[in-house]
Amino acid sequence: MLRNTRLLTRTISSSLRFAATKNTRLPTQHKFYSKKTDKKAEEPQSILTDDLLAKAGFEDPNEPKEKSEQQESENGEPSEEEKSNGQEQRSRRKRRAQTSKDIQRERYANMFYLATLVGGIAGVGYMCRDWDSEDEQTKLEGKDIDNGFAPNLMYGRLNKRLGSLFTFFSEPVFENLLPPPAPEAYRRPLTLVVTLDDLLIHSDWDTKHGWRTGKRPGLDYFLGYLSQYYEIVIFGSNYQMYSENTVGKLDPFHAYVSYALFREACRYKDGKLVKDLSLLNRDLGKTVLIDVEEDSWSMQPDNAIPMKPWDGSYDDTLVKLIPFLEYLATQPVKDVRPILNSFKDKSNIVQEFAEREAKLREQWKKDNKHLFDSANRPNAGNFLASLMGVPTSSVNKEPKMPLDIIREHGQLQYEHFQKYLKENAPKFLEEEQKLKDEFGKVSLNKLITEGAPSADDIAKVQAERAAAQQQ
């Protein structure tokens, strides 16, 4: 009995010791190995989980809605609740970010907007004022807009003055596109302005050769012959970077073309490209323009000879145009505009001038009939010529019309000049290369501070070289 009691006591004490050990170790394990940070007691949960309820056939009516919201959140689209929460947070953040500095900035911004509005209204009202002078009215081309405070007159003055603010982009860079003319003793009688594209040259493109540029037939003779009567100015409609080399090829010795102007010297008016001859620094009464675009001569139509664009085919229009231009330059004309306007169709001026010349020749023969009658009669001059061995055929010639004499003289001068160019061509090319080498050494700093070399500087260098060669 006693023995059984001792065994029971040992068993109970062992159980109690084991229970005490177990109770003391559980909190220690929970403290060091649990990842939960919330120390509050967990709420009791039902053993009936969603999986068990689904297997048993029970479904939650709110489950589709929750699933749809879950799918939306998984797809990256916020749910309605999240949207409302986000809007509330943004509104709170905005109210919280509105500081006194922000309020001050808003006040200054509102004051700036108000000042800009008032200044704009005042500026518009000032530009609607009456013309300050007749010079301003003429300069802004507002002759048809009178002074007054009628709405249409005020709007007209406002439009003209606003348009003048943007003339920087539509006007040429310089008021005088050409330097002053040469002294009277060295000056050509007239100035001939000719366009480049589709009059003197024509550019064409194809898949085999690409871009090709051709000279019009008779161009060299046209420029060389008329250069003795006219100051020739090529006024192209294309940009200088594209046309400058072409002009250099047409006149490699700089013997025919006095100046070359390009698109940068044109004026933009009402969306049109206009060549304003009044900016050439030449007398308009002694200036002739030959162009293929109607917009080019819209400001001086009386000075223009319109021509049809050349398409690259063979023609002799330039050569046929020489007699009229030669006649115009060799006559004592003070103003060429009345003569040009006397033609019915200036685009057909070659044919009309040929008809006028034929009538003039017939009239001259009638008026000088006695000269033709005495041409074939024997006289003392024929007898002396036969004694000297001069053929009588060279003496007994029909009298020549003054126009024919002028043309013979012009042709003779042209031939002499061409001969001179051929003989001195290497010398001209060498001098030109020396000038390029001399002025090509100009540094960028010198070009910015002193500018490009002028014509006087180039002439001075040429004179110094000529003097050095003579010594």
Swiss-Prot record:
GO terms for cellular component: mitochondrial inner membrane. GO terms for biological process: protein transport. Residues 105-110 are mitochondrial matrix. Residues 29-101 are annotated as: Disordered. Residues 1-104 form a transit peptide. InterPro entries: FCP1_dom, HAD-like_sf, HAD_sf, TIM50. Residues 128-471 are mitochondrial intermembrane. This is Mitochondrial import inner membrane translocase subunit TIM50. It comes from Debaryomyces hansenii (strain ATCC 36239 / CBS 767 / BCRC 21394 / JCM 1990 / NBRC 0083 / IGC 2968).
